[in-house]
């Protein structure tokens, strides 16, 4: 879950907000933002994850790799649960469900 204490959020959010602005600007400069966006997001997330892990622990070890893989898996699950599923539920209501799901 992406939840940390408010005090920690206040400490790190300004840097995250600045990074978001830079990423938005970079992607919007491109002709096909929908093509560029996934690569930029992947690059930034990977650099942050590996950079923090190496900065804290010094070198890669199995527990770090397992932890990082688990975190990215949880991010995917949480994003789907909180954002994609409600979006899809709305589309079912507006466009109709598949007959095969009945």
Regions found by a protein language model. Give the residues of each.
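Solvent-exposed interaction surfaces and binding hotspots enriched for charged
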Residues: 1-102
């Amino acid at each position: 879950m992406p939840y940390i204490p408010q005090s920690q959020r206040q400490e790190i959010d300004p840097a995250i907000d600045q990074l978001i602005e830079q990423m938005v600007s970079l992607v919007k400069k491109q002709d096909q933002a929908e093509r560029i966006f996934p690569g930029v997001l992947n690059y930034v997330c990977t650099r942050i994850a590996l950079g923090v892990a190496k900065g804290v622990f010094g070198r890669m070890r199995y527990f770090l790799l397992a932890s990082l893989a688990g975190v990215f898996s949880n991010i995917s699950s949480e994003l789907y649960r909180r954002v994609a599923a409600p979006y899809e539920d709305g589309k079912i209501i507006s466009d109709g469900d598949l007959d095969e799901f009945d």
